Amino acid sequence: MSVFISFEGVDGSGKSTQIRLLLQYLDEQSVPYVFTREPGGTPIAEQIRRVLLDPANRGMSVITEALLFAAARAEHVSRTIRPALEEGKVVICDRFVDSSLVYQGVAGGLPVEFLTQINEMATGALRPHRTIVLDLAPEVALARRTGEEADRIERQSREYHQLVREGYLDLARAEPRRVKVVDASRSVEEVQKDIRRLVEEVLPRRFRGAGTRP
């Protein structure tokens, strides 16, 4: 049985660190997995990523942004995610469709129905078995990123990122079985412990019960 797990959250919420620790844990447990990210995951999708995140493209319209994300996602799903799932692997993805619903929908103002439609076409209606949202106040997330060069989306206003946070929390309330919120303001070890527990809940039985040590 394959499992698809996505990670979401405001920029600076600690996704990269927590995913890295989770992958180390999966290695220790001999769980076959593929790690990938959005936008990106294939050569074509990575080219689209560069366009989307380039600060020089700050004038990009939200509809262009949404369509580019969907195009990258279509390529990503067909060439990376679905093949890995068909091989019975666990797929760990840094962002997926929920990012579009929240960033271009809730924060960007596009109709969620439109975003849902184009992304269902792009993915063949593929949905993660579990989505883990790392929740952190935007001002705290911004402070964590001091010294790092911000991309085009990260340079949006604090109000924009607050809408993103609220969008994720609303999503978790709407889909509580799939979307789980983890308080990312705590220590790295505490956050990782919760993530491992949530991941183990959806892993095939043969991979469960190996412990949740940080």
From Swiss-Prot:
Keywords: ATP-binding, Kinase, Nucleotide biosynthesis, Nucleotide-binding, Transferase. Its EC number is 2.7.4.9. Transmembrane segments: none annotated. It is an enzyme of class 2 (transferase). It holds the Pfam family Thymidylate_kin. It comes from the Bacteria. One of its GO terms (molecular function) is ATP binding. It catalyses: dTMP + ATP = dTDP + ADP. ATP binds at G9, V10, D11, G12, S13, G14, K15, S16. One of its GO terms (biological process) is dTTP biosynthetic process. GO terms for cellular component: cytosol. Belongs to the thymidylate kinase family. HAMAP family: Thymidylate_kinase. Phosphorylation of dTMP to form dTDP in both de novo and salvage pathways of dTTP synthesis. This is Thymidylate kinase.
